[in-house]
Amino acid sequence: MAKGEGNVLAQHKKARHDYHIVETVEAGIVLTGTEIKSVRAARIQLKDGFAQIKNGEAWLVNVHIAPFEQGNIWNADPERTRKLLLKKREIQHLADELKGTGMTLIPLKVYLKDGFAKVLIGLAKGKHDYDKRESIKRREQDRDIRRVMKSVNRR
């Protein structure tokens, strides 16, 4: 299975609008029992989340996993920092890339792969407002060109 495929449970839809995605990496997430049940129920939000590297370990921060309804006392803090499972050389590569100015790690999507929860992390650089407007303009122009070509080909 290729990266990013599987049963997609959550996506950060504005990520490609707000950031230039340079590279993506698949990582496992360390979750508690009730958290994985909430993730399987697609009760996860990636909107404000980001990843960081501390002491040679990757961590997922500000990702909200809603408490499992039947979990009562076993529920963990919905906003807790969760460890990401990556190989040492992947972590080192990402740490080296993050030293560049304006680079950050953002979660793009969460999905199940062979029964395990995985997160697709994107190495990204923030876009300026004029970049966002330019990409919208380019997308609309491409759409208009395709529409015209489609009508020409029908004749």
From Swiss-Prot:
Keywords: Cytoplasm, RNA-binding
Protein's GO biological process: trans-translation
InterPro entries: SmpB, SsrA-bd_prot, SsrA-bd_prot_CS
PROSITE patterns xref list: SSRP
Disulfide bridge map: none
Protein location: Cytoplasm
GO molecular function annotations of the record: RNA binding
CC terms in the record's Gene Ontology section: cytosol
PANTHER family, alphabetized: SSRA-BINDING PROTEIN (PTHR30308:SF2), TMRNA-BINDING COMPONENT OF TRANS-TRANSLATION TAGGING COMPLEX (PTHR30308)
Classification via NCBIfam families: PRK05422.1 (NF003843), smpB (TIGR00086)
HAMAP family in the record: SmpB (MF_00023)
Family: Belongs to the SmpB family.
Record function comment: Required for rescue of stalled ribosomes mediated by trans-translation. Binds to transfer-messenger RNA (tmRNA), required for stable association of tmRNA with ribosomes. tmRNA and SmpB together mimic tRNA shape, replacing the anticodon stem-loop with SmpB. tmRNA is encoded by the ssrA gene; the 2 termini fold to resemble tRNA(Ala) and it encodes a 'tag peptide', a short internal open reading frame. During trans-translation Ala-aminoacylated tmRNA acts like a tRNA, entering the A-site of stalled ribosomes, displacing the stalled mRNA.
Protein name (Swiss-Prot/TrEMBL): SsrA-binding protein
Organism (species): Streptococcus equi subsp. equi (strain 4047)
